């Protein structure tokens, strides 16, 4: 499937890059985002846009909330999933990456769904200190607080690599949960054991969010040897548009991580589109190394593609994470005003 020959897929291109961070880490020692921010999740709630995102401080991830009136200028509200006391499975940190939505239509603003009077967030946690250190598991948190600042986590993970197949024995990463035909579908990427490892994307099903059954066809989106996604097929962002399901994922070939697109009619059989949908930038640009970890929505007819941009650290950057500057930025289908 070639983007240049397929007018349908052209509608998901966002060639106009903002070129500056919409959110960057604080760089303040001791702050949850001292070294980097990552993994945007944008939705509309109580009359304004909200973004959950994760910050890294050298020890682990914590999740924070920001709000905006225009999708470009964001006000930080504070940490909503923080580090726990030692002993808990998620004591190192909690990377909140998805809150269950009313629907998954790309052409309507994403709004949160209440289930039994609660909003539900999916997060993952790594067992060791450091950057994504050790095999992560997936948990759930809930809130009845309309400010979305106060969350309660379930005591145990709801999904683990421990009972998974070989392709996921190295641990789990980002998940997203969509509802279809009164069933929950959780898409997630996982890695193989050892180094170097592969990351691929699979799915699991549930009736209650607590008990999950893996798809026997996993991984549904494997790596493609020799291609731009030959090592990682990661961080699914699944939405519905027209009569198709879309998965905005990122691929990695050992040098650059870039966002791509896969298409499905039934959530089980996926066809990858050829080449990246959102490519990394030129050397020195904000996303000169990586343009990855998509969050995609449409507002006032414009498609917004939020992502994590990475390039080598430069003098004056707010943060330095292992010699890299990692921030959240956005690209759009129309020029920014």
Ranges and model annotations:
Residues 258-259, 272:
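Short conserved catalytic/interaction loops centered on acidic-Pro-aromatic/His motifs
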Residues 35, 92, 133-136, 170, ...:
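Membrane-spanning beta-strands of outer-membrane beta-barrel proteins
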Residues 64-71, 136-146, 200-209, 260-267, ...:
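Beta-propeller blade signature
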Residues 38-58, 80, 96-133, 137-141, ...:
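Hydrophobic core segments of beta-strands in well-ordered, beta-rich domains
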Residues 285, 316-321:
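Short proline/glycine-enriched turn/loop segments at secondary-structure junctions
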Residues 1-44, 72-112, 147-179, 210-240, ...:
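Surface loop/turn signatures of beta-propeller and other carbohydrate-active proteins
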Residues 33, 46, 57-58, 70, ...:
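Acidic/polar residues in short coil/turn loops that connect beta-strands
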Residues 57-59, 88-90, 129-132, 166-168, ...:
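Short glycine/serine/proline-enriched coil/turn segments at secondary-structure junctions
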């Amino acid at each position: 499937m070639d983007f240049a020959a397929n007018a349908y897929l052209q509608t998901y291109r966002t060639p106009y890059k903002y070129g500056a961070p919409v959110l960057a880490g604080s760089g303040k020692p001791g702050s949850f985002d001292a070294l980097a921010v990552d993994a945007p999740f944008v939705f509309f709630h109580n009359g304004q846009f909200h973004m959950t995102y994760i910050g890294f401080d050298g020890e682990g991830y914590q999740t924070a909330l920001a709000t905006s009136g225009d999708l470009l200028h964001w006000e930080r509200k504070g940490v909503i999933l923080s580090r726990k006391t030692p002993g808990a499975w998620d004591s190192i940190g909690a990377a909140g990456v998805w809150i269950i939505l009313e629907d998954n239509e790309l052409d309507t603003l994403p709004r949160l769904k209440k289930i039994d009077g609660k909003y539900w967030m999916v997060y993952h946690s790594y067992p060791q200190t450091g950057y994504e250190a050790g095999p992560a598991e997936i948990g759930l948190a809930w809130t009845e607080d309309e400010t979305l600042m106060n969350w309660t986590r379930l005591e145990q993970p709801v999904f683990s690599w421990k009972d998974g197949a070989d392709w996921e024995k190295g641990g789990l990463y980002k998940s997203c949960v969509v509802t279809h035909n009164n069933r929950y579908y959780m898409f997630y990427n996982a890695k193989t054991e050892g180094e170097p490892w592969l990351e691929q994307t699979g799915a699991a099903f549930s009736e209650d969010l607590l008990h999950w059954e893996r798809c026997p066809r996993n991984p549904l989106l494997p790596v493609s040897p020799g291609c731009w996604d030959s090592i990682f097929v990661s961080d699914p962002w699944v939405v519905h548009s027209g009569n198709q399901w879309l998965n905005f994922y990122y691929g990695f070939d050992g040098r650059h991580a870039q966002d791509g697109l896969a298409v499905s009619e039934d959530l089980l059989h996926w066809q990858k589109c050829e080449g990246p949908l959102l490519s990394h930038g030129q050397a020195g640009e904000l996303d000169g190394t990586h343009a990855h970890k998509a969050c995609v929505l449409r507002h006032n007819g414009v498609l917004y593609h939020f992502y994590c941009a990475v390039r080598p650290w430069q003098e004056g950057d707010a943060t330095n994470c292992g010699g890299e500057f990692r921030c959240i930025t956005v690209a759009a289908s129309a020029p920014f005003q």
